[in-house]
């Protein structure tokens, strides 16, 4: 019965193809038309420049940079060839470098020759306890004063520094710094005289390290210090230990 009932409907659909479309197909087509197309994130290869053009652009930039450098070098060379003062400065600089190399080579050769012909011995200078105490105290004082000078110069860069710290440091450091005022002209409003003050203070510190060294006596009779005596004794013992295995092997 159901098959016979559906036969007229099927015949009507075949005979009338332009009949009404079912609701399922209408909703499906409307869903496709309303859904927006998703664009891909891949770049468009047609908009990108070809690789050959990029390489050519980089090569052209490199060539232009090299040519500009060569032109600038030629300009400097021509300017230097026309300026006798610059030529004299270059000549003096080259001669100074040659002289420094010769002095360094001569000192190296001399040290090697001395070390090869003579035995090296390190002796602590000084044999007086009082001299060592005075020298160490002076060295410590100069090092502390150097640190105070550094702190004083650093605080000059901070205008809002507390006066309770700045005033004592100014009382200690300004008399020494004022000695060197005016020796070096200021450069762009910057006072460079403290550089000379630090150089002199470092020279004093280096000189203080050599104060406990002993000087030879005027009559010519030199009595060895206790450190020298200990070193000679140690050297004799080491040489005796070195010769002992050789004598045992000969027996």
Swiss-Prot record:
Query: According to the UniProt entry, which residue ranges have a biased composition of type Basic residues?
Result: 232-243
Q: Where is this region: Disordered?
A: 232-251
Describe what happens without this gene. Answer: No visible phenotype under normal growth conditions.
Compartments where located: Plastid, Chloroplast thylakoid membrane
Transit peptide, residues from-to:
1-51
- A cellular component annotation (GO) from this entry: chloroplast thylakoid membrane
Going by the UniProt record, its keywords in alphabetical order are: Chloroplast, Membrane, Plastid, Thylakoid, Transit peptide, Transmembrane, Transmembrane helix
Membrane topology of the entry:
Multi-pass membrane protein
Where does the sequence pass through the membrane? 119-139, 183-203
- What is the top-level taxon of the source organism? Eukaryota
Family statement drawn from the similarity comment of this UniProt entry: Belongs to the YggT family.
Functional summary from the UniProt entry: Not required for the biogenesis and accumulation of native cytochrome b6 in the thylakoid membrane. Not functionally involved in the pathway for covalent binding of the c-type heme to cytochrome b6.
Annotated PANTHER family: PROTEIN COFACTOR ASSEMBLY OF COMPLEX C SUBUNIT B CCB3, CHLOROPLASTIC-RELATED, YLMG HOMOLOG PROTEIN 2, CHLOROPLASTIC
Q: Which protein are we looking at? A: YlmG homolog protein 2, chloroplastic
Taxonomic lineage:
Eukaryota, Viridiplantae, Streptophyta, Embryophyta, Tracheophyta
